[in-house]
Curated annotation (Swiss-Prot):
Compartment list: Nucleus, Nucleoplasm
Disulphide linkage map: none
Amino acid composition bias (Basic and acidic residues), ranges on this chain: 666-677
Protein name per Swiss-Prot or TrEMBL: Zinc finger CCHC domain-containing protein 8
BP-aspect Gene Ontology terms: mRNA 3'-end processing; RNA processing
Biased segments, Low complexity type: 399-413, 551-564, 601-637
Length: 743
């Protein structure tokens, strides 16, 4: 074996500088070994020469594709558009200039398109994985290398022949979407098999697919039956429709599954409340000696309401009805409509869950880190036995809340009766709201200072700020600003028969009627007032229906004013009295008086040939020779004489506070004589002949002299609708028949 010398001796010899350097590295001991080595060296030299020639050829070819050195590129659009390798072909040689001009026209076309559509987004062309990067090994920064890679990536290499083309790299995708790229149409092939081939001895259950909708006439899936161009075959359509419905039913039955409570319990049976498993400890990242983080939060929020719902006792849910009342099947007691919504709730304390560290004591080796979590220590009120006693005492199984509900209803109803509508109820409600707000503020202030135990309330329970209901029999509370109503005005006793009424003096001051506010009336007074008004209406209807044709009218007025002492005075209108021609020769005074309601006695019925004198409690009408004495509060008619024409047929109608003069001409006399049927349509009144000592009725200008007008702003102006309606009712066939029967 030849001894190999690494040249270390020559190195040291050169360092010493004494001996000349020799270039002998390999030494051969025998001639045979030298010949073999020389043959190997010659072979390697041939291989090296061949590889060197190939390397030179590759460098020459690469120089055609490689990017020019030192060319700066700022963007990928600054790179080359394409690189053409012109082959030795007659077409490439002949149309070399046309190809270059076409490429130049493409540049111009792109620039024009970009200027016209500046807002349009350009395609994001990414090089495909098969692309080749034309790059030289140079020292450039990262941004420059990124632009070079994008600009000098060969994304396509196609060799075009006369009859075909050969694509070596494939076409890139536009925006990574094959639909936007030409040449990426994937052909659809027919399905060769329909079922999966199973192994030997195995059965594969293939799920039935839902049939696709198709035309029942021809079986095509491209159109519906109504658009089928072929003639309809009804028998074939019915058969295909039946097959489609059967297939849909089979596919639907496979998906129908029922879930039962037992299956759910078996599925989640390993999860138990209050028990921390090893998997949960690992998921929470806690050790065996650490309390779960939710325990500290439960100390602030209380017992979980979901598990409290699980401990709630359920009743049968059946209700018995007897037509009037409902019987609860749980306890057999009668339940009102008001208490139907509020059902009785009770709890089974044996179903309360044990939570170590919350309602039961934690093991002694566990750490209570409530300060680290910003919580509170374990509360004594959260103990399981204390909470169970609270549920048992507050929600016993056989108790009911009907008494509290009824007492609260009674107190609320009585309070509504006593409250005023003028504003006291607003004060009362405001005071109650202030009380409730103060209670809530106290609750929040206490909770902020220190933690207080508030056990969760069952559904339907009142909030903390709601005041408790009053016990049964408690009188309603009086509002603070309540003003008691004044006592009712006593009614003066009726005057005996023959007693002349007091004549008011013209100089005496007039006492205005006392007007009370309707807001001071209580509910009992309003009901009494309503009852009296209905009685007056019934009296008035019966009086109007029973009156004779020659009987003066007595109307019961219905008070529309809020005052209890006011009388509703109807406005007068012109009336044609029912008289003979002889009686109309002298002037007469027709007086129409309206009273509130005669307390004693009936309607005014005059005697034959006598004056109109009412019974007790009615208005007074003067006799012959006496002055006109009005009702109390009515107008004063002076006794002064006035110059009147005795031969003229004049009739003065006096109605309440209004005085009208009706001049009845001879035409009216003829009309009253010729048309007796029209007499019923007029107002019935009595004409009283004046005293022979008097020359006539005073002039119109002197009427209402010295009378204080009664003004009431809230009283609406009279339109006469009531009188017209009453006239229509009196002319009805029913009233006409009654009047004929009475005559």
């Amino acid at each position: 074996m030849a001894e190999v010398d690494f040249g270390d001796t020559e190195l040291f010899e050169q360092l010493d500088g004494d001996l000349p350097a020799s270039s002998v590295h390999v030494r051969f001991d025998s001639e045979g070994e030298a010949n073999d080595v020389q043959e190997l060296v010659s072979q390697h030299e041939e291989t090296i020469n061949r590889l060197s020639a190939e390397n030179q050829e590759l460098k020459r070819r690469l120089s055609l594709l490689n990017r020019p050195s030192g060319l700066p590129v700022e963007d990928k659009l600054d790179g080359p558009l394409l690189q053409i390798l012109f082959m030795n072909h007659i077409i490439s040689k002949q149309y070399h200039q046309e190809i270059e001009e076409f490429i130049t026209s493409l540049f111009q076309k792109y620039e024009e398109h970009r200027k016209s559509n500046s807002e349009k987004t350009s395609f994001n062309i990414k090089p495909q994985p098969s692309s080749i990067l034309l790059e030289e090994n140079d020292d450039s920064d990262a941004d420059t290398m990124k632009n070079i890679k994008q600009a000098f990536s060969v994304v396509g290499s196609v060799q075009y022949f006369k009859n075909f083309c050969l694509d070596k790299l494939g076409q890139p995708l536009l925006n990574e979407n094959p639909q936007l790229t030409e040449g990426w149409d994937i052909p659809k092939y027919q399905q060769v098999f329909t079922q999966i081939v199973s192994l030997d001895g195995q059965e594969i259950q293939v799920k039935a697919k839902r049939p696709k909708p198709c035309c029942f006439n021809c079986g095509s899936e491209e159109h519906q039956m109504r658009d089928c161009p072929k003639p309809r075959d009804q028998a074939h359509i019915n058969m295909k429709r039946k097959e489609f419905l059967d297939a849909c039913g089979e596919a639907g039955n496979q998906n129908q599954q029922r879930y039962h409570a037992e299956e759910v319990e078996e599925r989640f049976g390993k999860y138990k409340p209050g028990v921390i498993s090893e998997e949960l400890q690992e998921a929470l990242g806690i050790m065996d000696k650490n309390l779960p983080p939710f325990i500290y939060r439960m100390r602030e929020l209380g017992y979980p309401p979901g598990w409290l719902k699980e401990a709630e006792l359920e009743n049968s849910g059946l209700s018995l009805y007897d037509g009037k009342e409902r019987l609860d099947a749980s306890d057999g007691e009668i339940e009102d409509r008001d208490t139907e919504a509020k059902k009785h709730v009770s709890y089974d304390v044996s179903k309360l869950v044990n939570y170590p560290g919350f309602n039961i004591s934690a093991p002694p080796d566990m750490f209570d880190e409530w300060q680290m979590f910003g919580s509170i220590p374990m509360q004594q009120a959260h103990q399981k036995d204390i909470f169970a006693n609270y549920l048992t005492d507050s929600f016993p199984p056989g108790s009911s809340n009907k008494s509290n509900k009824r007492s609260s209803c009674q107190s609320s109803s009585s309070e509504r009766k006593r409250q005023k509508t003028s504003g006291n109820h607003t004060v009362t409600s405001a005071v109650m709201d202030m009380d409730m707000e103060s209670d809530e503020d106290m609750y929040h202030s206490r909770a902020s200072k220190g933690y207080m135990f508030h056990p969760p309330l069952p559904p339907g329970s009142p909030s903390y700020g709601t005041p408790p209901p009053l016990p049964r029999g408690t009188p309603p509370s009086t509002p603070p600003n309540f003003i008691p109503p004044p006592p009712p005005t006593p009614t003066p006793p009726p005057l005996p028969k023959g007693t002349p009424p007091p004549t008011p003096n013209r100089d005496s001051p007039k006492v205005p009627p006392q007007v009370l506010d309707e807001d001071t009336w209580t509910l009992e007074e309003l009901e009494e007032k309503q009852r009296l008004l209905w009685a007056q209406l019934d009296n008035g209807e019966s009086t109007n229906s029973d009156c004779d044709a020659h009987t003066p009218i007595t109307v019961s007025s219905v008070t529309s004013s809020p005052s209890r002492t006011e009388l509703d005075i109807a406005t007068g209108r012109k009336a044609a009295p029912r008289q003979t021609a002889h009686e109309l020769k002298s002037p007469c005074v027709i007086t129409k008086l309206f009273v509130a309601e005669p307390e004693e006695g009936g309607p005014l019925i005059p005697e034959e040939g006598g004056p109109l004198i009412p019974e007790e409690g009615g208005p007074l009408i003067p006799e012959e020779g006496g002055p006109l004495i009005p009702e109390e509060g009515g107008p004063l008619i002076p006794e002064e004489d006035s110059e009147t024409n005795e031969d003229s047929n004049e009739c003065y109608v006096v109605e309440g506070n209004d005085i009208e003069v009706n001049k009845l001409s001879s035409k009216h006399e003829n009309a009253s004589e010729k048309n007796p049927s029209d007499e019923d349509a007029t107002e019935e009144a009595a004409c009283v002949e004046p005293s022979p000592k008097r020359s006539g009725v005073p002039d119109v200008s002197k009427f209402a002299e010295g009378i204080t007008p009664f003004e009431y702003d809230n009283m609406s102006d009279s339109t006469g609708v009531y009188l017209r309606l009453r006239g229509l009712l009196k002319n009805s066939p029913r009233n006409v028949q009654k009047s004929k029967k009475q005559v």
